[in-house]
Amino acid sequence: MPADGIYSLPFEQQIGQFFFIGLPGTDFDEETRALIEEIKPGGVIVFGRNVESPDQLRALLDAARAISPINPLFGIDQEGGLVDRLREIFTPMPSARAIREHGDLAGVRTLGRVTGELLRRLGFNMNFAPVMSIMTEQRDLLSNGLYSRSYGRTPGEVLGYTTVYMRGLQGTGCLGCLKHFPGIGAGEVDSHMEMPVVRLTHDDLLAQDLAPYIELFQRQDDRVRAVMVSHGGFPNIDIRTGTTGGLLEPASISQGIVTRLLREELNFQHLVVTDDLEMGAIAKRYTIEDATVRAFEAGEDMLLICATPDAMRRGYDSLLRAARDGRITEERIHASLSRIAEAKALAQPPLPLDMERYQQLSDEILALNKKLNYTYGGSTNAAGMAGSAPVQSE
């Protein structure tokens, strides 16, 4: 069914379009089939736990696509470096920091282009990259997990590299997604564990971490059509009143950040997705039911629930109840469906899994790594495929 068929889906399936879910494992087994048939998700995200071989991965995504009423968005965090979900089946990709320290704009263009084509050949149509965080020398000392994932120390540096990366990636027909809005480089902890608190003022945020977003939003030729919102807390610009002392909410479930800042002030009217709602920054404060409804009410279009099938089902059931009860209005539902349909219309169908071309792409990354003098733990074999590199945590 074409993307605009989203409006003719049964109500329960329309609600499913708001979910981006993870899959249990490498096989399209009965558990996986049941999960997709129950939720009918608008998106599927892949992690290292789902990856065994190129043929296996493509078959997994093709099977999910075949039973979906509308083609899902198939996404992955394929940044390179620390966050490289495909390193067990493809040459490990260099980190953003390695490219930036080498001053290699041609290299980041190659990384974006190769990543985009590789993903389409494996069955994907979306990449949750690039990371837009600014990591100054002072921020490098923080334990937020972003040290090697950033493209720069200044807004201009981040803008330069991410612009070229996006052109390379999206030029292949694979959608990119800027993350983690509105910028958590100044946060002191990792969102997987706790809520990072960023104490910048509104004006400082606009001048620093938001500056690359603002510039890219205004460049029509670069077609930024998706943003991921972080779980960071921003006490100097977003405190929800009505409780004693105010309540600091994660950005992903904050109307102040998603609607007032991103939608209204910065006028971004395209797809907005949450970071994983099972991360510690959310899970230690909210039930999955509460987080799901709050995120949608805040203005998010798609809700990532990545790890636990039970949490995915509970999140879906809670949003369906909220919609049936009138807590979520028909107008609000239609607005998000429209933005999801736009993204799906832009997403291109998969390319053939041509193993000769796959090897050529692998060789391009191998050459880039050599130019950068970049290695990631383990080794690469003569064919350039990944060796015994460790698998990152999900």
Identify the meaning behind each predicted range.
Residues 1-39, 254-255, 264-265, 283-394:
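Preference for extracellular/luminal or secreted protein segments
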Residues 10, 44, 77, 119, ...:
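Divalent metal-coordination and catalytic microenvironments
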Residues 19, 41-50, 100-101, 149-151, ...:
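Short, basic, glycine/proline-bearing loop/turn elements
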Residues 22, 28, 49-67, 72, ...:
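Second-shell residues forming the walls of enzyme active-site clefts
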Residues 34-47, 114, 118-126:
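Catalytic domains of carbohydrate-active enzymes, especially glycoside hydrolases
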Residues 65-91, 108-136, 158-162, 166-182:
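Glycine-rich, aromatic-flanked loop segments that form ligand/cofactor-binding clefts
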Residues 90-104, 148-152:
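A charged helix-plus-loop insertion that forms the helical arch/lid used to bind
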Residues 134-145:
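Short, conserved phosphate-binding/catalytic loop or strand-edge motifs used
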